[in-house]
Amino acid sequence: MFDKNKKVSVFAAYRGSATSKNYVQKGTKNFDKNGAAKNNNRNLASKNGGKLKGPLKRSGSYSDGDNGSSSSSGEDEEDDSTDSRGELYDSSESGEEYTLNNHSSQSSPETPAYTRESLKRRNDEAEGSKPIGAKRTSSTPVGQKDEEDDSTDSNGELYDSSESGEEYTLNSHSSQSSPETPANTRESLKRRTDEAEGSKPIGAKRTSSTPVGQKDEEDDSTDSSGELYDSSESGEEYTLNSHSYQSSPETPANTRESLKRRTDEAEGSKPIGAKRTSSTPVGQKDEEDDSTDSSGELYDSSESGEEYTLNSHSSQSSPETPANTRESLNRRNYEAEGSKPIGAKRTSSTPVGQKDEEDDSTDSSGELYDSSESGEEYTLNSHSSQSSPETPANTRESLNRRNYEAEGSKPIGAKRTSSTPVGQSTSAASKKNTVPVKVEVASPNRALLSPQSIEMEPGDSMFCRIKIGVIKSVQPGGDVGAEAGAGQAVNRLEPCHEVHKENSIEVGKRTLAQLIAPMTMATFLRDHWEKSPFRVITTTSGGFSNLISFKMIDKMLIQNHVEYTTNIDVTSYEDGVRKTLNPDGRALPPSVWAHYQRGCSIRILNPSSYLVQLRQLCVKLQEFFHCLVGANVYLTPPESQGFAPHYDDIEAFVLQVEGKKRWRIYAPTKELPRESSGNLSQTELGDPIMDIVLMPGDLLYFPRGWIHQAITEKDSHSLHITLSAYQQQSYANLMEKLMPLVVKESVEQTLKLRKGLPLDIFQNLGVANAEWNGVHRQKLIQHIQNLAQRLMPTEGQIDRALDQLAIKFQHEALPPTIAPQELKRTVYGAQATADKTGHCSLDYELAEGTAVRLLRANIVRLTVDEGVLRCYYYTDNGLEYCKYEPNFFELEPFHGTVIETLIHAYPDYTKIKDLPPMGNDEDRLEFVEALWERGILMVEKPFKKV
């Protein structure tokens, strides 16, 4: 075991100078309280994600235009009961109430048994006693274990009488201590004490071969919360919060399953939680392969994976929940040959997602599946004011996953099989007077089905003057024709077979390709990026339904501290006048929905702070775009308009989720502007280039500078998301960083630049002298121009200027999300145990032969600032825009060579012994271990099964 004290001294070696110089080491410094806690600057609301004067806050987006996004756990389709606060519950669940307060100087924990009991520490009674509040179901003395039965507390939680756990609230740097929830969570906050040799895993309920609450030898039973247990699993969920003000647990499996519970009908399948018919325990690895989840992430079926929200410096953390939910996330238990995954309809003898002889199957996102997987996604948020864990695979899969019925049938919810778009007229008169337009038709899942291209002619509701979006019918992710040969696709984007070996830039590229499919990336970048708008028509309406919904917004408002102006806007546009109608304070559902019923539009400025699935989408895209990808959500009542015509300074991707909305797009008055416009009047617009109605599942792209306005129709509301990218990411921004460097260094080297100005220069130059064309004036102008020509940037100056832009990305980026197969290879899956004497043991240890790599391609940036070598990183960023100062540490040159080697080796792994020498092998090992412990590195082979 390595010497931890010695490692601390190694950190001090390259951090000490920064400490003494008052440099920022890690993003623990906040801006002033007025900016960090509550920023009412309207620049934030009008230019989401843009620079603010003064303290910055993450808005999650950039533009003043219609932007947005969302995601949350849903409710049961049939019978959602509500408590006194209007919170939805499934009658089968043992849920709790949570008050999730964000930006709150004081945490107000809600009332569940765990929370109330954790407010006052429990005093465990005699040996074997049960937790306070556990209901007694036996004549056995209190807390004593019956031979066969585990008792439950009032919340339906299972307890083993061998446990005598206490609840602790471990809050550091907290203005008030808010207790965390049940024993499993609390034990994950503080290291668990392992018992004698042979004892059950940390937090495991049972040491018997029969799972807790299981009724017979072959059945996987559920506890009172509906949690599924297999005797081969000892999985639990942990919320690892450091410096946390309040942690609120997410609700149980039944609730999340009610989001998208699917009961499989066909022979051989079983619904979630059904009895097992296979000899392979749930989550146990099959003999041959690792599988992938719906995001293309590879999992080993031997994992008992859960979702984790790892928040550091977080005012709130919402842990994800139990087995049924985790299994509904991505766990697929394949029974006998021919069985299908949860919710999927089988049309082949080959297991769903299993590779056939020639083909790898993909989900709707183009992700590869294997029948042995049990994967989930994790969101690792640090320095977050709040983390809202997203829900299971069924939800993520619903981003694009469609359950295909019998062979030849159309996808569930598919519609609009006509070649005429909704709202478009095909009258003969309109055909004679308009120009045909080709728009892209997306397959139901934007990836799996063969794409089609249809030609439409604009009708009464789609006036068009020029061709927009002429698109070929090609395989998603590829291009055809002369570029590739007859019928041969190029640039096919396929996921890596192993998640921990994926290149995050390629993952982002593949994600974008799925959004714009069947248009190819080559066509998009060549013909439309920064050039012209286009529309993708889907053949199904549920393409983005898992990201946001009416119910999700209501739940988000209840469970999170969402404030007007900072997080949400109420707007209207009537008689050519745009108004913002924000009250003060927190935005609770009654207030928000009252404005909506009066015809106002609702804009959520930073939904990715609360909605994990939307955040996962943005995180993947930011790796490809190398800049923050933000999101806004817009909810507009029928026959309403919330915003005046305007243009934005971002590249916009509009995802229509619910209802329909009519968009009018106008040619730009200025190409690629650097700033957004103000509100424009209708008289400034002219004729629209595009006049279309977006339906659920449709996508619309338009570059920055293109004027747009949108209005709902009489018979429908509208809910849409706008993803925004590439704000302030131009050559002009690079030159603004570069030229000051050039001038500063040229002054040091050029005497003429340091000479004083002529005494008569004021009498010869300036606006008042512009009309005078005297000889002396011309000599002065020529001399100044000659000096400017000497300001030629060097390669080193260009590199340093680019690094300054990269630091901006490190500061703004969302923290990474971690997959289960990555979890067991990173610090986020590490655990510690302590014996009865308090001696702590770690479950990991790096060695010279350990192979490591960066967690993500853009996770770090090496820079030289004022002669000091620094490494910036974004693993500890918050979920709100620039909530903390940039995270970095200072390095010696030999430290820098190690990081540089890892950057160039990515995505490949490098053994520690093959990294550049650094004094001695022990110093190098400790430095690499220090990087791993900050979440920057990942090992190739897990230390243990997590």
From Swiss-Prot:
Compositionally biased residues, Basic and acidic residues: 117-128, 187-198, 257-268, 328-338, 398-408
InterPro entries associated with the record: JmjC_dom, NO66-like, RIOX1/NO66-like_C_WH
Positions of modified residues (Phosphothreonine): 309
Chief localization: nucleus
Pfam families the UniProt entry points to: JmjC_2, RIOX1_C_WH
Phosphoserine PTM positions: 339
GO biological process assignments: negative regulation of DNA-templated transcription
Biased composition (Polar residues): 17-28, 37-46, 99-110, 169-186, 239-256, 309-327, 379-397, 416-433
Cofactor binding, per record: Binds 1 Fe(2+) ion per subunit.
Cofactor: Fe(2+)
GO MF, one example: histone H3K36 demethylase activity
Protein's name according to its UniProt entry: Bifunctional lysine-specific demethylase and histidyl-hydroxylase NO66
Residue numbers binding Fe cation: 646, 648, 708
Protein purpose: Oxygenase that can act as both a histone lysine demethylase and a ribosomal histidine hydroxylase. Specifically demethylates 'Lys-4' (H3K4me) and 'Lys-36' (H3K36me) of histone H3, thereby playing a central role in histone code.
GO CC terms, sorted: nucleolus; nucleus
Family: Belongs to the ROX family. NO66 subfamily.
Domain JmjC, chain residue ranges per copy: 606-742
Subcellular location: Nucleus
Catalytic activity: N(6),N(6)-dimethyl-L-lysyl(36)-[histone H3] + 2 2-oxoglutarate + 2 O2 = L-lysyl(36)-[histone H3] + 2 formaldehyde + 2 succinate + 2 CO2
Transmembrane residue ranges: none
Lineage top rank: taxon: Eukaryota
Keyword terms of this UniProt record: Chromatin regulator, Dioxygenase, Iron, Metal-binding, Nucleus, Oxidoreductase, Phosphoprotein, Repressor, Transcription, Transcription regulation
